Curated annotation (Swiss-Prot):
Active site per the UniProt annotation: S205 (schiff-base intermediate with substrate)
Keywords: Cell membrane, Decarboxylase, Lipid biosynthesis, Lipid metabolism, Lyase, Membrane, Phospholipid biosynthesis, Phospholipid metabolism, Pyruvate, Zymogen
Task performed by this protein: Catalyzes the formation of phosphatidylethanolamine (PtdEtn) from phosphatidylserine (PtdSer).
Swiss-Prot/TrEMBL cofactor(s): pyruvate
Protein name as annotated: Phosphatidylserine decarboxylase proenzyme
Cofactor binding annotation: Binds 1 pyruvoyl group covalently per subunit.
Pfam families per record: PS_Dcarbxylase
Residues recorded with modification Pyruvic acid (Ser): S205
EC nos: 4.1.1.65
Cited InterPro entries: PS_Dcarbxylase (IPR003817), PSD-A (IPR033175)
Length: 240
């Protein structure tokens, strides 16, 4: 429990969090347990293997380095301009489509594919108040397949965003073929800022962002672009 901000029925505010200092580490906090255990095991095996013949230690050292790389949490420069929509995930932007959403209405959906080499922390696209967090059980299809959006296990986080008149923005965390663990600590009533971390998907997967479509919306991102959570600008709502 100590490795998590929220886990099971335990939760505390930042002011009461005895482990808040872990937010300053260069690694994602919710991955510290795996990071410590897997790195230590890999390094111990490297020492043992190296005792017999040093080249045998190389694969274990590489595994330790890969684990540390996977759970890294680089600092991001978050745009402050009102109306700016930033990427909720690192990876490759594989989809920009217009959709009719049952809650948002006329909308634009952005799909981001995360490989095992990307940072897997999820960040808020626009500041707002969380109005719904919904979990759906499902399959574990390859995240590159279009049907994974609806059929795979996922979590929706919906925010009411004052910068666009209180309309809803949705971020969906989707599991993949190998990524079968979603972490989300956003709670209904939380007020989250643009670029603020709210969760993580462990191993390769997919993240989607759905925003309202209107005449004031200018999309600046392009399909195929490599994006960074919290800093890459997807779109802007012109203020006027």
């Amino acid at each position: 429990m100590k490795y998590y901000r929220n886990q099971d029925s335990y939760w505390w505010a930042d002011a009461d969090d005895p482990f808040l200092w872990r937010e300053s580490l260069p690694f994602v906090r919710v991955g510290l347990a795996e990071l410590i255990i897997m790195t230590l095991v890999s390094l111990v095996l490297a020492v043992i293997a190296g005792w017999f013949w040093w080249p045998l230690a190389v694969p274990f050292v590489l595994v330790a380095a890969l684990v540390a790389w996977f759970f890294r949490n680089p600092r991001r420069k978050v745009p402050e301009t009102i109306g700016t929509v930033v990427s909720p995930a690192d990876g490759k932007l594989v989809e920009i489509v217009e959709v009719d959403d049952p809650i948002i209405g006329a909308a634009v959906r952005f799909g981001i594919f995360l490989s095992v080499f990307n940072v897997h922390a999820n960040r808020i696209a626009m500041p707002g108040r969380v109005v719904r967090v919904r979990y759906r059980p499902g399959k574990f299809l390859n995240a590159l397949r279009s049907e994974s959006t609806k059929e795979n296990e996922n979590i929706d986080v919906e925010l009411e965003c004052p910068e666009i008149g209180g309309r809803i923005v949705r971020i969906r965390q989707i599991t993949g073929q190998f990524a079968r663990r979603i972490v989300c600590w956003a709670r209904v009533g939380d007020v989250l800022q643009r670029g603020e971390m709210f969760g993580m998907i462990k191993l390769g997967s997919r993240t989607e962002l759905v925003i309202p479509r209107d005449e004031a919306l200018e999309i600046v991102a392009q399909v195929g672009e490599k994006v960074c959570a919290g800093s890459t600008v997807f779109a802007r709502y012109q203020q006027g």
